[in-house]
Every structure is written in structure tokens, then in C-alpha cells.
Amino acid sequence: MKLTTMIKTAVAVVAMAAIATFAAPVALAAYPITGKLGSELTMTDTVGQVVLGWKVSDLKSSTAVIPGYPVAGQVWEATATVNAIRGSVTPAVSQFNARTADGINYRVLWQAAGPDTISGATIPQGEQSTGKIYFDVTGPSPTIVAMNNGMEDLLIWEP
């Protein structure tokens, strides 16, 4: 093997390692990302290719009727907007919880469908989708909305 070929190969290996080192923090955000209700919180998917923003606002008790769902407590709602910043985004509506200050969670009624609910349909880059998310609150009133992937909180909106 020629010396110039070996040098080119070594430079390429070092360059690839540097790119991987500097690009990794983009995909490995420190969760949870927190903000105020009404603010857009931005996250990146696990491989760093899709960037999306979620905005959750106006958490309150609701007079909405959820067809086909037997409510055990009081229906609460929030307005959610998902923004496909880079890449197409399929909204993970099922990951939302309304939460009390002392940690009681109320899962989103992700199966609730209606003209004002946020769609779980994929949206293309540069587009956004807005709608209501609903919760069946069976205890103390929530003040926080959290997005949790089943292992950890990703995004948290507080008053």
C-alpha cells in the first residue's frame, strides 16, 4: 500500500470520528426539556434526523363530550400543536399526560376522535397540526402537561 493511500485513509477515519463525535450531542438531548405552557419545545428523534416542535397551551377543565368513552372523572383539555421542523413527523399523541404538582398522572385519551382533536396523521416537513388533547381527571386538578415515551419524560410544560 502506498504511503499517500495510507495517509488519505487515516485522515478519512479521523474525519469520520470527528463528525460522529460532534453530531452525537444533537441526537442525544438531555431530557426532559422543560418550558412554560404555551411555549414551543423542540426535540430531535433518537437518530437525529427528524426535528419537531410541540406547543401545549390552555390546560383547563372541559365541557367536551368524548363519544364512546365512559368518563370516570372530569374531562380536561389542552391545545397542542406539532411542528415538523426537519423531516416528516408522525405525532405521538399517545405519549401525553396531564400531571399534578405532586406527580399524579392522567393519561391522554388518545383514542378520542373528533373535529377538534389533534390528528395522529404524518405531517410533512414545514407543516404543522393543531388540535385538542383530552384527559380523564379522576383526582386533583393537573397543572402540568408532560410527554413521556414510557421510559422517561421528554417534554414538560409547567405554569
From Swiss-Prot:
Signal peptide (residue range): 1-29
Keywords, in A-Z order: Secreted, Signal
Main location: secreted
Matches recorded under SUPFAM superfamilies: Antigen MPT63/MPB63 (immunoprotective extracellular protein)
GO cellular component: extracellular region; extracellular space; peptidoglycan-based cell wall
Compartment(s) of residence: Secreted
Highest taxon of source: Bacteria
Protein name (record): Immunogenic protein MPT63
Organism in which the protein naturally occurs: Mycobacterium tuberculosis (strain ATCC 25618 / H37Rv)
